[in-house]
Design a protein with these regions (language model features):
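N-terminal beta-strand motif that seeds the catalytic metal site of vicinal oxygen chelate
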Residues: 1-15, 68-70, 120-127
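Core segments of cupin and vicinal oxygen chelate
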Residues: 4-48
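Vicinal oxygen chelate
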Residues: 5, 28, 82-127
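Acidic/polar helix N-cap motif
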Residues: 9, 74-77, 110
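Short amphipathic alpha-helices within nucleic acid-binding modules
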Residues: 16, 76-84
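Short hydrophobic/aromatic beta-strand element in the GNAT-like acyltransferase core
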Residues: 36, 50, 69, 105-107
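Conserved, structured core segments of small domains
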Residues: 45-56, 103
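Acetyl-CoA-dependent GNAT
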Residues: 53-58, 121-123
Length: 127
């Protein structure tokens, strides 16, 4: 899976995605009219997809359209990510929803105004 997200402030978006998901970045690609940052999973983001942050007059942040759902491994990791979201300029705009069967889910806006989601899964204890 590869994700491309439009941004208006590349430095701010880099801080957000590094801080929330532990992604590491590669050198910037300057491909006029776009400036592109590629972020890759690190040890702290085991199942995170690769992400490109694109600053371009052809791409605009949005809270509609396709919804990208980032998965973290534990409910504790979900709570830690939500703390980082708030600290790095994002907005959590729904409560964490317990979807049953050990799944939790929440919607938010990143620091650029893109709507994304977070989910976590922990197996339920055996009865």
């Amino acid at each position: 899976l590869w994700i491309e997200l439009p941004v208006s402030d590349l430095d701010r978006a880099l801080r957000f995605y590094r801080g929330v998901f532990g992604l590491t970045d590669t050198p910037l690609y300057d491909e006029p009219p776009a400036l592109i940052a590629v972020l890759l999973p690190s040890d702290k983001a085991l199942r995170a997809p690769g992400v490109s942050l694109i600053k371009s007059p052809l791409h605009h942040p949005a809270d509609g359209g396709a919804l990208v759902n980032f998965h973290v491994d534990t409910h504790q990791a979900l709570e830690a990510a939500l703390t980082a979201v708030a600290a790095l300029g994002g907005t959590v705009d729904t409560p964490v929803i317990d979807m049953g069967d050990g799944v939790r889910y929440v919607n938010l806006l990143d620091c650029e105004g893109n709507r994304i989601a977070l989910s976590s899964y922990e197996p339920l204890p055996e009865e």
